[in-house]
Amino acid sequence: MSKPVEFEMLVDALKSLPGVGTKNAKKWAFFLLQQDQKYIDDFIKRIKDAKTNIIKCKYCSNFGNKDECDICSNDYRDFTKLMIVTTNEDLERIESANIYNGLYHITNGEVSLRKNVVIEHTNIKIIKERVLNGSFKEIIIATSYTHDGEVTADYIVKMLEDIKDIQIYRIGFGIPLNSSIDYADDETLKQSIANKRKIRI
């Protein structure tokens, strides 16, 4: 049975969301079509408001309402530590575990030949400038334990190799291979950071 083209377009739009397959996209499409106009208008308004009013921090790319996010502007954070993560979800996951009190840098992607993602498509290229302009003594690389995450970590280490007086670490055992931080529980995150391994002095 064929569906209206508008329905198929709605399903395609929903499938573009992370982790949403055809089955769930159709389920959500049917749900949305069954709602009244007020629900739909409010739903759309919330998306537009979020897109309009939420911006990225000029330092770390964390989301907030100001140029400088609540973490980067918090005087109680440890400004000598910088943790490099891949996504906003990774940052949120670590923050929710209350195991780290330094600053962050979100790369917004990992180097991937398979996905055609190069350095220029990410925030990796500005890490060195941020380190040079900051007072960091410790860099913790917390990219995923995947092929792309390891390639990205290696690139960051090489990029910072001529900067003296900083220690560079990689998150330790705990995060499974081919996995990312946002899937780890609190104890796993705690162990991976506590067991971070030094990869350069």
Swiss-Prot record:
Return the protein name.
Answer: Recombination protein RecR
Spell out the family assignment given in the record's similarity comment. Answer: Belongs to the RecR family.
Q: Which HAMAP family match?
A: RecR
State the gene name recorded for this protein: recR
Can you provide one Gene Ontology molecular function annotated for this UniProt record?
Answer: zinc ion binding
**What PANTHER family is this protein classified in?**
RECOMBINATION PROTEIN RECR
Task: From the UniProt record, list the coiled-coil ranges.
Answer: none
Cite the Toprim domain residue spans from the record.
80-176
| UniProt KW keywords | DNA damage, DNA recombination, DNA repair, Metal-binding, Zinc, Zinc-finger
Zn finger (C4-type) ranges are: 57-72
UniProt lineage: Bacteria, Bacillati, Mycoplasmatota, Mycoplasmoidales, Mycoplasmoidaceae
GO BP: DNA recombination; DNA repair
Q: What does this protein do?
A: May play a role in DNA repair. It seems to be involved in an RecBC-independent recombinational process of DNA repair. It may act with RecF and RecO.
Q: Does the keyword Metal-binding apply?
A: yes
